[in-house]
């Protein structure tokens, strides 16, 4: 039987987004990583339910020359050391590269599904940008949008709009408990 996953965007979901010149930006170093409240306990709850937490993240600053790949890899090594994550799948491309992995394309989720034998239709995508939700939708996942005050040009329709990973986790736990009680395999 294929596994279920919770795909998570990184910045704004796992760790605090850094605002620079009014725009949400990723941490520039390991020292700038600040985990959001409740993240570790949420991931532990999801693992306890048999879900695989997998980070799927766009990191275009590498392609733009604004960040070194080694720094991004150090940040990810730190997150894997601190949190119960199955793995982290990264797109280093910029929009102009027209790749299939950069969200809103579903390539990162498809790659993770192939690598870890994930059942996408029984999995979840949690993000804070329209691109996260759209990637999850295109991959067939149940989607969550953590509402932030970003100025987004695109609008999205998520299955659930929530305030935090904590709230999203409560919904996932509730759906799985309800399905278990009803004896169904669905969420």
Residue ranges and their predicted role:
Residues 1-52:
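Active-site neighborhood of HAD-like aspartate-dependent phosphohydrolases
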Residues 75-95, 153-173:
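Structural recognition of alpha->loop->beta junctions
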Residues 125-163:
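Acidic, Mg2+-coordinating phosphoryl-transfer loop and its flanking beta/alpha structural elements
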Residues 100-131:
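Conserved Lys-Pro-Asp/Glu-containing loop-to-beta segment of HAD-superfamily phosphomonoesterases
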Residues 5-7, 54, 124, 160:
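Hydrophobic "anchor" residues on beta-strands that sit immediately upstream
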Residues 62-83, 103-115, 144:
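Short, electropositive alpha-helical surface patch
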Residues 1-10, 18, 170, 174-186:
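Non-catalytic pre-domain segments flanking phosphatase-related domains
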Residues 39-72, 76, 85-94, 136:
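Substrate-recognition element of Asp-dependent hydrolases with the DxDx(T/V) motif
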């Amino acid at each position: 039987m294929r596994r279920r996953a919770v795909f998570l965007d990184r910045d704004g979901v796992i760790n605090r987004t850094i605002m620079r010149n009014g725009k949400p930006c990723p941490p520039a170093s390991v020292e700038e990583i600040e985990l959001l409240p409740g993240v570790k306990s949420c991931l532990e709850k999801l693992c306890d339910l048999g879900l695989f937490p997998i980070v799927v993240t766009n990191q275009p600053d590498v392609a733009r020359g604004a960040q070194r790949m080694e720094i991004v890899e150090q940040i990810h090594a730190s997150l894997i050391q601190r949190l119960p994550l199955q793995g982290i799948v990264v797109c280093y491309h910029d929009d102009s590269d027209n790749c299939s992995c950069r969200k809103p394309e579903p390539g990162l989720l498809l790659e993770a599904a192939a690598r870890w034998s994930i059942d996408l239709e029984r999995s979840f995508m949690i993000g804070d940008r329209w691109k996260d939700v759209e990637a999850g939708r295109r991959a067939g996942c149940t989607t969550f949008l953590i509402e932030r005050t970003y100025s987004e040009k695109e609008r999205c329709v998520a299955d659930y709009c929530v305030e935090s990973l904590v709230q999203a986790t409560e919904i996932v736990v509730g759906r799985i408990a309800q399905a278990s009680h009803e004896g169904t395999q669905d969420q």
